[in-house]
């Protein structure tokens, strides 16, 4: 793809093999360009700045690391694997023939389940307002490609989802970060940004946000909708962690009933990341356009995947699984939070729900450098720079509580903290 080629060229520029010239292209670096070309005998280069795209690629490629406290998924034994296997067996034994394409909107039975679930949370939609996608990432991509034009100012959570930042920049948007707080948004900062810019959209994750796991209060949701109305921007609510929330609470979409809000959800976090089943709910005219764009860009999504997902969420044990998962996550939050506090970490928020804790330590000022060292010890951390709209050195780290209970992780952190204290002295 174009994105892959550009990414490869950017990596070669960062490594010193190519130079990029505005409005001209990429060229092989000559010896006269910025001193000596890379290679044997060349002087040592400065350490390049943290490369978030490269790090993201490593997260998914490097499966051999034994510890993954920085990852964005659950351990396989926390998921509903038995139900997935049952659904697959059922589909293979007496399911319909699946040698053709699926429906443009996606499997009708699953869309009806989604619509019923949203109705339980006070969002009135029918199945024709639901579009199934290959995970929430495709949903975000479709919405961005339909609604974002080159040069648009687009607001995002800061820190937030790095793939979204890349996606929006690739669409030509000017990406502006809105600082998160434990109760939602830094509203004075948001109002200052609205006075300085004319954003067309705000992509946000009010509930159990990654990486902070913060939860926007109802008051913040109402204020955000008021500001969207006053300043004329749309809202995209990425609510992929909703099933991990033990408290029934309103979403932006339920308060707005899809007037200004586009709602995105996913089953990948709680069933299996490999199933890649997400969805978009939107007003009917916009959803019809998203269906057309989905067909243009990749035809239908996998009906096999959607039928397997349907079998799982209609399994009689599905709700019990979610309840057990929430309890397990709450217990992990308490245990990991205690360990971090005992080591002297500062916690941004203590939600006791969702997957993450966002933490920093005064003696570990550079989480990117720490993450490089951790990789050598077989540990995949979640450095804060990865999630910032404008990457810069930071001590913040994202800890996935379901992967953060290995004693080797804590020994590594203790050693690095002690080393940091010795350097400071």
What are these regions (language model features)?
Residues 1, 282, 358-364, 381-419:
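Conserved PLP-binding active-site segment of the aspartate aminotransferase-like
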Residues 1-89, 295-301, 331, 335, ...:
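N-terminal basic, amphipathic alpha-helical segments
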Residues 84, 257-327:
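Conserved core segment of the aminotransferase class I/II
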Residues 91-231, 243-258, 418-424:
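Conserved core of the PLP fold type I
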Residues 153, 174, 234, 346, ...:
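Residue-level detector of anion-binding/catalytic polar loops
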Residues 156, 177, 235-237, 309, ...:
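Hydrophobic residues in well-ordered beta-strands that form the structural core
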Residues 327-337, 347-360:
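Conserved glycine-rich beta-strand-loop-beta hairpin in the small C-terminal domain of fold type I
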